[in-house]
């Protein structure tokens, strides 16, 4: 089993912009399915909900539809460099990554078949306003959040985090349980996870991963207090298949306690 220090060392050379170029330069099959997943999840969300994006990386795709549905969005990550990448976009910096294609496609999936430039700008500005808090986090600690944050959230989103920061099943389960502990009673967990991952790749760099599947996820969520009947899950194949994992699991879990 690898310890936390070793895991953190793996990410000292993580390049946020390289990661964005590797996975978000275009809207490929995987990104299309991710945008569809979030469009579906946010159709019936309470408008005064608070959302935590846990382990955001340098990305925004999962927050585009959320911005129109929730009251406030908090973002946390282990790396300050990832948070800075998002803050560049929030400030409208000319060197920020261009998320406009993702915003346009998200709006289309929400039902707007002819998205205008004005509508795209309005959604971007709405997301900028809803992004109110940035803080550091460590999934291996409880409490996991550092700095300015709430004690609990109505919605917690976590995209490709616990299985992508360790090669240990024990550490993966502990990290997921720590993240779930940030939910309010009767909160909602939106989880996307790599299936049967051996690694994931950013350009020439290889990062750790742990092999999990649908059964393992369900078992761990049950330990966290969610009923299997309250978990909606589907799996899509990896595309392209060479990235080190078999597929992507898209999971919505509603807690009732």
Regions found by a protein language model. Give the residues of each.
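A short acidic, Gly/Pro-enriched loop at the edge of an enzyme's catalytic core
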Residues: 142-156
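Conserved class I S-adenosyl-L-methionine
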Residues: 46-59, 72-77
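Class I SAM-dependent methyltransferase Rossmann-like catalytic core
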Residues: 1-48, 61
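Acceptor-substrate binding/catalytic loop of class I
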Residues: 167, 197-216, 241
């Amino acid at each position: 089993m690898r310890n936390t220090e070793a895991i953190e060392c793996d990410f000292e050379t993580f390049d946020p912009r390289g990661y964005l170029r590797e996975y978000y330069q275009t809207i490929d099959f995987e990104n299309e399915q991710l945008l569809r997943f979030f469009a579906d999840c946010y159709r019936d969300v309470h408008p005064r909900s608070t959302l935590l994006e846990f382990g955001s990386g340098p990305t925004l795709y999962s927050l585009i539809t959320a911005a129109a549905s929730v009251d406030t969005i908090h973002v946390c990550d282990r790396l300050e460099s990832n948070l800075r990448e998002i803050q560049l976009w929030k400030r409208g910096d000319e060197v920020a990554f261009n998320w406009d294609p993702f915003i346009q496609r998200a709006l289309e999936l929400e039902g707007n078949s002819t998205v205008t430039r004005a509508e795209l700008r309005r959604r971007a500005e709405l997301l900028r306003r809803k992004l109110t808090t940035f803080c550091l986090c460590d999934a291996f600690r409880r409490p996991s959040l550092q700095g300015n944050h709430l004690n609990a959230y109505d919605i917690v989103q976590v995209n490709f985090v616990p299985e992508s920061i360790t090669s240990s099943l024990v550490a993966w389960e502990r990290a997921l349980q720590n993240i779930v502990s940030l939910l309010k009673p009767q909160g909602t967990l939106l989880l996307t996870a790599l299936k049967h991952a051996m690694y994931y790749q950013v350009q020439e760099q290889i990062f750790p991963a742990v092999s999990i599947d649908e059964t393992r996820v369900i078992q761990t969520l049950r330990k966290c207090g969610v009923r299997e009947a309250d978990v909606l899950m589907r799996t899509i194949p990896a595309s392209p298949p060479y990235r080190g994992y078999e597929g992507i699991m898209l999971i919505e879990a509603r807690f009732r306690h």
